[in-house]
Design a protein with these regions (language model features):
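Bacterial Sec-dependent N-terminal signal peptides
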Residues: 1-7
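Catalytic-loop region of hydrolases
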Residues: 22-23, 48, 55-58, 64
Length: 187
C-alpha cells in the first residue's frame, strides 16, 4: 500500500533507531564479536565508527557517566579545552550522549525510559548546546559530531523540548554536503 511521505520518513526513522538499539538475532552475532574487541581510542575509519556505535551496552560504564556528570552537564574526565586536530577528546561527550540515549531506549534492562537517565541526557545535551564545542579539524564539526549526535537526537526525539530540538537542528546543519573527495562517503 502507498504511504505518505511523512509515513515513509517515520518508518525510516524507526528502522534507523532499531539499528542502534536492536538486540535481535540478526545483530546477535555482530554484538558477540564486538564484545570481544577492545574499542579503539582514536577512530579514523567510517566502518569502525559505525561498529563502535553498535557496541553492546556497558551498563557499568554508563552508570559511571550518570554518577560523575557535573551540574553543568560536563564530565570531569573530558578535556573540554582540547585543541588537537586528531583524536579530539571533546567528541567523547557526544559519544557518551549516544550511549546514554541507546540505553534509555533499549527495551532490555532496567534503564528503559528511566527518568534519572533521561535527566542526565538532557543535562549533557544542555552542555553541548550551550557551549557549542568546535574542533580545529573541520571533520569533527561537519561529520564526526553530527554522525554521532544525529542518532541520539532521533532516539530522544519525543523527549526533546522545542529549544533542544532547535539546538539539535543547529548541530545537524553543520553537516555540509558541498565537499568533494573521499570524505563524501561519510555523509
Amino acid at each position: 500500500f502507498a504511504q505518505t511521505p511523512q509515513q515513509e520518513l517515520e518508518r525510516l526513522q524507526q528502522n534507523y533507531i532499531q539499528s542502534f538499539i536492536s538486540n535481535d538475532d540478526r545483530m546477535a552475532s555482530l554484538v558477540e564479536l564486538l564484545s570481544g574487541i577492545q574499542p579503539e581510542m582514536e577512530i579514523s575509519d567510517q566502518v569502525v565508527v559505525e561498529l563502535h556505535q553498535r557496541y553492546p551496552f556497558n551498563v557499568e560504564k554508563i552508570a559511571g557517566y550518570m554518577e560523575t556528570i557535573r551540574e553543568d552537564g560536563s564530565w570531569p574526565d573530558i578535556n573540554y579545552n582540547d585543541q588537537k586536530r586528531s583524536g579530539w577528546s571533546v567528541k567523547e561527550h557526544a559519544d557518551r550522549v549516544l550511549g546514554l540515549a541507546k540505553l534509555y531506549r533499549a527495551e532490555e534492562g532496567d534503564c528503559h525510559w528511566e527518568p534519572k537517565l533521561e535527566s542526565v541526557i538532557h543535562l549533557a545535551l544542555g552542555y553541548w548546546f550551550r557551549e557549542k564545542p568546535v574542533c580545529k579539524n573541520w571533520w569533527y564539526n561537519q561529520i564526526g559530531v553530527p554522525k554521532t549526535l544525529g542518532p541520539a537526537f532521533l532516539l530522544m526525539k519525543e523527549q526533546l523540548n522545542p529549544e533542544e530540538k532547535e539546538a539539535a537542528i543547529e548541530v545537524m546543519e553543520n553537516a555540509k554536503f558541498g565537499m568533494t573527495g573521499q570524505n563524501k562517503v561519510w555523509l
